[in-house]
């Protein structure tokens, strides 16, 4: 339901952030600070307060969004958006169960013979799925053209997954996924794993950061047919601000404290180290 006011002291405004837009209103004469606070009240934890952002409004004269002029105040119906600045800044990379979602990409039977260390990334991927269930983190799973390439491998337990969806696009970011994300409040971080690193993982990660999400790629749970393709994809993605990490690092960051009520269960998952394959020496 839109937050609207019927009296003449308020002006209707369409607030947009990332892929979301919401109708609301502000008092006549509202300026920069009021508008920023309104964005925070509407989108809450979806806005990473540590990032640099710019406020823009839609100019009818120019037919596009422009930066908010100095001294701007709302006097009539308008459209505003908050845009993360694409700068070479180092993300803090903090993970929290309340603001995270796991993406499992195309871990299908047909890829088993071709993908390097496929058995190892299945094992690590299953650890991540188990950890997500313990911590109550939503999981979405894609399958690339399952009619021809088969379903997700049986070793991966998809019990409780929020969404398992087919795709033909290499990126996981398709309308079905975006609709599912819109139903999960406060998502800020995506933990991404699967195949292939230089194709579907890379294109998914780039689409996600373009939409304002923080992306963590699990290096010991992603691979390709070619180790060279994998290596250069991870290097490129790291330069764009995407975090390259490991499964154990992700799970322990999510519990954060030995006193966390789920720590023992997570500890049981990582008690036996992840497979020491050739993947990590080729990151």
Curated annotation (Swiss-Prot):
User: PANTHER family under this entry?
Assistant: HYDROLASE, ISOCHORISMATASE DOMAIN-CONTAINING PROTEIN 1
- Spell out the coiled coil positions from the record: none
CDD domains documented for this protein: YcaC_related
Q: Give the InterPro entries listed for this entry.
A: Isochorismatase-like_dom, Isochorismatase-like_sf, Isochorismatase_domain
**Gene assigned in the entry:** isoc1
- What domain of life does the native source organism fall in? Eukaryota
Q: List the disulfide bonds.
A: none
Q: Which GO terms describe its cellular component?
A: cytoplasm
Pfam families noted in UniProt? Isochorismatase
State the similarity comment.
Answer: Belongs to the isochorismatase family.
Gene3D superfamilies the record matches: Isochorismatase-like
Organism name: Danio rerio (Zebrafish)
- What this protein is called in its record is Isochorismatase domain-containing protein 1
């Amino acid at each position: 339901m839109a937050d609207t006011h019927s009296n003449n002291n308020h002006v209707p405004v369409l607030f947009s952030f990332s892929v979301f837009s919401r109708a609301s209103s502000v008092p006549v004469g509202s300026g920069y600070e009021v508008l920023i606070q309104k964005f925070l009240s509407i989108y809450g934890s979806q806005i990473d307060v540590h990032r640099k952002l710019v406020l823009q409004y839609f100019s009818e004269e120019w037919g596009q969004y422009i930066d908010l002029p100095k001294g701007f105040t709302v006097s009539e119906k308008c459209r505003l958006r908050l845009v993360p600045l694409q700068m070479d800044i180092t993300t803090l990379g903090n993970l929290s169960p309340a603001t995270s979602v796991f993406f499992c990409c195309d871990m299908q039977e047909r890829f088993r013979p071709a993908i390097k260390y496929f058995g190892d990334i299945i094992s690590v991927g299953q650890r991540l799925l188990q950890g997500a269930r313990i911590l109550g983190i939503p999981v979405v799973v894609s399958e690339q053209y399952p009619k021809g390439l088969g379903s997700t491998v049986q070793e991966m337990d998809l019990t409780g997954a929020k969404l398992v969806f087919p795709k033909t696009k290499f990126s996981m970011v398709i309308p079905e996924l975006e609709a599912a994300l819109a139903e999960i409040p406060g998502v800020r971080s995506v933990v991404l794993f699967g195949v292939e690193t230089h194709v579907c993982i890379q294109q998914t990660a780039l689409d996600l950061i373009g939409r304002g999400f923080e992306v963590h790629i699990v290096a010991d749970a992603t691979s390709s047919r070619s180790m060279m393709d994998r290596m250069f994809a991870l290097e490129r993605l790291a330069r764009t601000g995407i975090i390259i990490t490991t499964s154990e690092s992700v799970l322990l960051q999510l519990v954060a404290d030995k006193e966390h009520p789920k720590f023992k269960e997570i500890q049981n998952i990582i008690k036996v180290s992840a497979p020491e394959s050739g993947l990590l020496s080729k990151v």
